Amino acid sequence: MRIIVPATSANIGPGFDSIGVALSKYLIIEVLEESTEWLVEHNLVNIPKDHTNLLIQTALHVKSDLAPHRLKMFSDIPLARGLGSSSSVIVAGIELANQLGNLALSQKEKLEIATRLEGHPDNVAPAIFGDLVISSIVKNDIKSLEVMFPDSSFIAFIPNYELKTSDSRNVLPQKLSYEDAVASSSVANVMVASLLKGDLVTAGWAIERDLFHERYRQPLVKEFEVIKQISTQNGAYATYLSGAGPTVMVLCSKEKEQAIVTELSKLCLGGQIQVLNIERKGVRVEKR
């Protein structure tokens, strides 16, 4: 049995802690034979291979008496880069418990568990449902809406350095002014309406006018401004920080994709430039 979970890009401008989209990078968990103890085989750096692995901790949180198994973990989702690496593991752990424990969890139940563990739904929701998911959590009341993201390309600049979510959150203010809150809320409304209508030009305008978090976090990613400048000059819809960063995401049409990649490559920035596609499916299980 294999459990496959997509990467995610969350926040998307003013969609702070609320909006995320599933993208074409993946965590794959191969479930092998029962064992006397948990073993997670992988080639990742500084990640436990025993029961202390987040995958196993999550599964045991859902069902504490699961029989230990030998597992293989493969992932091309970079760690601490703002592409939902921890969320993908949490969602995989929930699905692992669901399968081994024969729990028959609904998607809603998976989202509730994942949100409790992660703290907010913006990454875990698209990892569960796929595509674009707009979510809210208010006093433990979780609502989510899955919709189709308009056809487009996501060009990711993935820096060689990590940026922990905790560090990225530390630069955020404790409060916003009433004026800024109203302005950013209205911009978020326009962004959501534009995405639902398929109007990526207006959506891009709104994405770049966030007041909730990007203006505080962008200085932590020194490459952001030049990437935004070049991408805008070459017809991108928007440039934004993916999740808490440091990945910089460029949203553009398929037609503009190659030109933007070519121009960004000329900058010789310290990182990788990768074109990602929208993943329409969330977590899935392949049984052999």
Curated annotation (Swiss-Prot):
Top-level taxon of the source organism: Bacteria
Query: Into which family does the record put it?
Result: Belongs to the GHMP kinase family. Homoserine kinase subfamily.
Instruction: Give the matching SUPFAM superfamilies.
Output: GHMP Kinase, C-terminal domain, Ribosomal protein S5 domain 2-like
State the protein's name.
Homoserine kinase
Pfam families per record:
GHMP_kinases_C, GHMP_kinases_N
Question: Which reaction(s) are listed as its catalytic activity?
Answer: L-homoserine + ATP = O-phospho-L-homoserine + ADP + H(+)
Listed under GO cellular component are: cytoplasm
Cellular localisation: Cytoplasm
**Protein's pathway:** Amino-acid biosynthesis; L-threonine biosynthesis; L-threonine from L-aspartate: step 4/5
Assigned EC number = 2.7.1.39
| Record keywords, A-Z | Amino-acid biosynthesis, ATP-binding, Cytoplasm, Kinase, Nucleotide-binding, Threonine biosynthesis, Transferase
Picking any one GO biological process from the record gives:
threonine biosynthetic process
Role: Catalyzes the ATP-dependent phosphorylation of L-homoserine to L-homoserine phosphate.
Any GO MF annotation of the entry:
homoserine kinase activity
**Species, as recorded:** Streptococcus agalactiae serotype V (strain ATCC BAA-611 / 2603 V/R)
List of residues binding ATP: 78-88
User: By which gene is this protein encoded?
Assistant: thrB
Kindly report the protein's main subcellular placement as a broad class.
cytoplasm
